[in-house]
Amino acid sequence: MLYHYIKIAFRNLLKYKLQSFICIVGLAIGFTSFALSSLWIRYELTYDTFRKDADRIYYVRMESETDDQGLSSVTPYPLARYLKETFPEIEESCNTSAWKTDFLYNEKKYESFDMVMDSATEHMFEIELISGSRDFMIPKSNKIAITDKLAKEVFGTKDPLGEKLKIWSDDMEICAIVKSQDQHSNFPFGILKPSRQTEEWNVAYCQTFIKVR
């Protein structure tokens, strides 16, 4: 009986070739679109899931009441502290921002992600110190930390501590090596610096995160 049904199906496919071709192509496109959409959704939903307590960390966005720009990904620096002090449900809050930047070492040009952060970011994002000191967290200093991955790329087997990188027009001294976070993340970084602290609410330049209890 099954053989009979298969035989009839093939006969119909051969009899109505154009319609069969359109149906098969449409079905293939549908399955392919579904598979690609599923992969994309999975990719988007796995950002930073490797972090400890990832299900308790939230990205704060700001809605403007003065224009039609909608939600903004940047927030004022004082917002993180205000949220933690105002809402007891918030265990921790932090400010950070990252962008791709060029730097020079021995007149050779390199490229990496430069991330500025406050002290709370170090704990919330589990930034692991391999060697050196945490002087790179001192505001307005010329100290920076780089990842072990970037250190290997730029210096090879040479110890990078004490070496200087020219970032923009500033000579920044490497005082620490931190562990690279190569997992799927919104915040890839190679260089770490302290964020510029300000009490101005009318200037939005950083990204705020909160960790709920």
Q: Where are the regions that the model predicts?
A:
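Membrane-proximal extracellular/periplasmic loop immediately following the first transmembrane helix
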Residues: 37-102, 204-212
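Short, strongly hydrophobic transmembrane alpha-helices
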Residues: 15-43
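A short amphipathic helical element positioned immediately N-terminal to and/or at the very start
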Residues: 5-14
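N-terminal hydrophobic targeting signals that begin at the initiator methionine
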Residues: 1-3
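Short acidic/polar micro-motifs at solvent-exposed secondary-structure junctions
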Residues: 62-72, 95-120, 126-144, 182-184, ...
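Mid-to-C-terminal secondary-structure elements
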Residues: 118-131, 144-213
